[in-house]
Swiss-Prot record:
Keyword Nuclease: yes
Gene: rnpA
GO biological process, one term: tRNA 5'-leader removal
Name of protein: Ribonuclease P protein component
Function: RNaseP catalyzes the removal of the 5'-leader sequence from pre-tRNA to produce the mature 5'-terminus. It can also cleave other RNA substrates such as 4.5S RNA. The protein component plays an auxiliary but essential role in vivo by binding to the 5'-leader sequence and broadening the substrate specificity of the ribozyme.
NCBIfam families in the record: rnpA
Record note on quaternary structure: Consists of a catalytic RNA component (M1 or rnpB) and a protein subunit.
């Protein structure tokens, strides 16, 4: 089971916008880039939070390993989705050296970064940054 369609960040221009305008939070194995975007007229109907995952060849030359890491990250996102507030665009970048990392470690680091970025347990924003 993959990440629901409405929670996927796919287009190149969306990734670029998050990289240029968003904030950056780091941990030993992950980097997240975040950008808050919401409908200006009604914050109750804001867009769901979208996630993009980037695993470069610096992490591993083998696509099988990169895809396994992406599956682990998607599973961690699915587990955290009920706690995540709406209106965010998040790009998760996997750092080199994460090949040996287990699911529990990814989940713990991702949750800590999302809390730090106020995407989990953060206040609901009613304005556009």
């Amino acid at each position: 089971m993959g990440l629901p369609q409405e929670h996927r960040l796919k287009r190149r221009k969306d990734f670029q916008k998050v990289y240029k305008q968003g904030g950056r939070y780091t941990s030993p194995h992950l980097i997240i880039r975040t950008l808050f975007e919401s409908c200006s007229e009604n914050s109750l109907n804001s867009q769901p939070t979208c996630f993009g995952i980037s695993v470069s060849q610096k992490v591993s030359k083998k696509a099988v390993i990169r895809n396994r890491i992406k599956r682990l990250i998607r599973q961690a996102i699915r587990e955290l989705l009920p706690q995540i507030s709406n209106g965010w665009k998040v790009v998760i970048v996997i750092r080199p050296g994460s090949v040996e990392c287990k699911y529990d470690r990814f989940l713990r680091e991702l949750k800590q970064l999302l809390i730090k970025a106020e995407i989990i347990n953060g206040h609901q924003r009613e304005y556009i940054l």
